[in-house]
Amino acid sequence: MSKAQTLSAADRAKLESLIGHDFAEKERLDRALTHASARTEKGSNYERLEFLGDRVLGLCIAELLFRTFGTAGEGELSVRLNQLVSAETCAAVADELNLHLYIRTGADVKKLTGKRMMNVRADVVESLIAAIYLDGGLEVARRFILRYWQGRAVRADGAKRDAKTELQEWSHAKFGVTPLYRVDERSGPDHDPRFKVTVEVAGIKPETGVERSKRAAEQVAATKMLEREGIWQQSPAGN
């Protein structure tokens, strides 16, 4: 991370090239890259921009998914949206832009690691989106988002995460609850056991799965619920 100073002309030109937009008001880009720990005056950091950028990103990603997955239901679209606007995805975009070279922070933040540092990188991406939106308008912001998210949206189609993760995100978004898994039965000999597991989400019918391990049975139950609710397409018979 850089020290608390404005971008050099060379760094600004390099970053604007990666963004695909030359800022009319250069101060907006500086503010988008300034963490609260490095601010010198009220309103000079990215916190307000982050608030706006989160909404602009959500709108553009929702529109992208709506147009890309024409047969997907609301549940599936919500899961995809949550994945694409997550801190993990935003931090990955930050890494692609090498934003760690430009973010301005105080000394205490430079010591952060792991998830907390990932959240800082993700926040800066959202503030950057807001700065682009304010400087160039929605179309320019959309162009930037498509540049770095469209490929991720398409790749996500063939690379769904495990069923338990998908079900948890959907149930949080839809009902505000976490799925509950219960082992109903363990049968068979020790060398070849069978586990029957039920998954429950408040407000809808439960589903069960039977497999040779508890985790595998949970995955089967979660998959059946995702398919029944239209979040995932149902697997062909025999698969």
UniProtKB/Swiss-Prot annotation:
One annotated GO biological process: mRNA processing
EC numbers on record: 3.1.26.3
Keywords: Cytoplasm, Endonuclease, Hydrolase, Magnesium, Metal-binding, mRNA processing, Nuclease, RNA-binding, rRNA processing, rRNA-binding, tRNA processing
SUPFAM superfamilies: dsRNA-binding domain-like, RNase III domain-like
Subcellular location(s) of the protein: Cytoplasm
Membrane-crossing residue ranges in chain numbering: none
Name of the top EC class for this enzyme: hydrolase
Domain DRBM: 162-231
Positions of the RNase III domain: 12-137
Role played: Digests double-stranded RNA. Involved in the processing of primary rRNA transcript to yield the immediate precursors to the large and small rRNAs (23S and 16S). Processes some mRNAs, and tRNAs when they are encoded in the rRNA operon. Processes pre-crRNA and tracrRNA of type II CRISPR loci if present in the organism.
The protein's assembly and partners: Homodimer.
PANTHER family: RIBONUCLEASE 3, RIBONUCLEASE III
Family: Belongs to the ribonuclease III family.
Name of the molecule in the record: Ribonuclease 3
Organism the protein comes from: Rhizobium etli (strain CIAT 652)
Gene that this polypeptide is encoded by: rnc
